[in-house]
Amino acid sequence: MTPSERANRLYVRVMQYAESGKADSVTRFAPMVLAAHQMLQTPSIDERYHYGRVAEVVGAPEIVKAQADTILGLRAGSLLGLVLAARAERLEKNDSAARVFDKRLLQSLERELATQNPDYANHREEIDQAVADARLRKI
């Protein structure tokens, strides 16, 4: 198994635990996921998103923010980067900054989806939820 495959499998496991409310399992496995992602030599945008999402689940906004910043530095309109950036700001109770990222998400949505980026297909539910939430906030 490659380091990337290992990191991805651990990510899937921890996110399943988080969605099932198994906090003890999240606490047990999250450090392994974070370590596996730190060992990736050239992480993809998708892998950076995974790293940020697990950091979000364990309440590490500085990691979430760093991954979002890196993703957006690589691709300014990245839906994954914008979703992650808004979540990072909300973790830090900075709703006004989160709304800025929500607005950018809505502005970038159609253009980015038109690229048919496979990462967007893999995380479509999360993107759709972030878009729905942003629209409810009446950005």
Name every feature range the model reports, one short phrase each.
Residues 1-10, 37-43:
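TPR-adjacent "capping" and linker segments in tetratricopeptide-repeat scaffold/adaptor proteins
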Residues 99-139:
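Terminal, low-structured helical/coil segments at or just beyond the last alpha-helical repeat
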Residues 12, 50, 84, 130-133, ...:
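"A position-specific structural signal for the A-helix of alpha-solenoid helical repeats
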Residues 6, 63, 126:
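Soluble or luminal CAZymes and related metallo-dependent hydrolases
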Residues 15-75, 84-88, 104-110, 118:
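Alpha-helical adaptor scaffolds
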Residues 92-95:
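Exposed beta-sheet edge and beta->alpha loop/turn motif
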